[in-house]
Amino acid sequence: MENAAFGTLCRLGRAVPRFIPALNRLSSAALSARSYTDASDRVFVTPRRVHFVESEYAVPRESLAGALTELRRAVPRLADPVMFPVEVRVAAADDIWLSTAYGRDTAYIAIHQYTGLPYRAYFDLFESVMAEVAGRPHWGKLHTLDAERLGPLYPRFGDFLRVRAETDPESRFGNAYLSKVFDQAG
């Protein structure tokens, strides 16, 4: 859906949250089912003029259907309605130690909420569903995992921490976020 039209629907939903289910149906009707193949910079790069908060997790590809089913079952029980669709994409396994696709074919599930609408309960619910399927959070999007919870999700996490300590022993390249996700590991 075109940015301006979707932005208008989101602002209306934020102003009158009880309209969100009807606005979502309108948005869904305006979207067309489509399938296409092209270079990733042409497929995944789109202008985003509607502001939102986002969380994204990578799950084993074989867990995708179950995770989406659980999310679809649980979201209607939230006190606050969700304004954005869920995004899904897939990728092949790789061998990059801290990649969300390390060692497994992966499906990515991204959730969003329009800026100014409550999102914490939705994101907490999402994280609990992702935890059930060994989901790995996108390093640059909202999540609450710390080193203690991230370590078991990445088979080479300890190796990475060792290399990090050797190459940056004084944490000159650190910040509060990196301390949270790397320094609390035991």
Name the predicted role of every residue range:
Residues 1-186:
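Noncatalytic alpha-helical scaffold of FAD-dependent oxidoreductases
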